[in-house]
A protein has these predicted regions:
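Conserved N-terminal beta1-alpha1 strand-loop-helix module at the mouth
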Residues: 1-93, 100-127, 143-146, 153, ...
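Short, glycine/charged-rich beta-strand-loop motifs at protein surfaces that mediate ligand recognition
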Residues: 138-142
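Cationic, amphipathic, low-complexity alpha-helical segments enriched
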Residues: 165-166, 170-175
């Protein structure tokens, strides 16, 4: 599965901190029913066995809704469970190495906060960029804010031409 432009129309990223006592599965299913077009499992506090169990359950839900399922950071888990793709940050494995490991048919997203990072991600085979946070957020303590001018510069530098298949998504950090 490759990343199509419509996959990024409503890209949800999980964070159990904001569940307010609800189950992650229920919130994800509600989101899928509401029109989410791609889901990233980003649960930094879960131990690997719990993460894998959660990932398998949510992957099955996403498949029921024909929505790509992306694993955050963990390329080995994405590979082991045949996830649709993986999203990596600047301190994770480089996109070139991720592409070698996952092959040509998986979706690879890369976080970028600068034009240089965006261009390198494109060169190394990323299918989309996650740029942000564009607005201040309380949902990610270590988020580096990206100005609107920087976002525009990234969009100009990596224009998303069909031949490059590069997509961009700004991360506004909307929470329920």
């Amino acid at each position: 599965m490759k990343c199509a432009e419509q996959d990024l129309l409503l890209y949800a990223v999980t964070d159990r901190h904001w569940l307010s006592g609800r189950s992650l599965r229920d919130v994800v299913e509600e989101s899928l029913r509401g029109g989410v077009t791609m889901l990233q499992l980003r649960e930094k506090t879960l131990a690997e066995p719990s993460f894998l169990a959660e990932a398998r359950e949510l992957q099955a839900l996403c498949r029921d809704y024909h929505v790509p399922f992306i694993v955050n950071d963990n390329v080995d888990i994405a590979l082991a469970m045949d996830a649709d793709g993986v999203h990596v940050g600047q301190s994770d494995m480089e996109a070139l190495d991720v592409r070698r490991k996952l092959g040509p048919d998986k979706i690879i997203g890369v976080s970028a906060q600068t034009v240089e990072q965006a261009l390198l991600a494109e060169k190394h085979g990323a299918d989309y960029l996650g740029v942000g946070a564009v607005f201040p957020t309380g949902s990610k303590d270590d988020a580096d804010d990206v100005s609107y001018d920087t976002l525009k510069a990234i969009c100009r530098a990596v224009p998303g031409k069909e031949e490059s298949m590069m997509r961009r998504s700004a991360l506004p950090r909307v929470v329920p």
